[in-house]
Swiss-Prot record:
Two-domain structure with an erythropoietin-like N-terminal and a Ser/Pro/Thr-rich C-terminal. It comes from Sus scrofa. This is Thrombopoietin. GO terms for biological process: megakaryocyte differentiation; positive regulation of ERK1 and ERK2 cascade; positive regulation of megakaryocyte differentiation; positive regulation of phosphatidylinositol 3-kinase/protein kinase B signal transduction; positive regulation of protein phosphorylation; thrombopoietin-mediated signaling pathway. It comes from the Eukaryota.
Amino acid sequence: SPAPPACDPRLLNKLLRDDHVLHGRL
């Protein structure tokens, strides 16, 4: 499946949130 546009603020927010959660679990 094609990746959604990188300019999508909701996508960026989700990626940032997921990244933050992953780092918090380390």
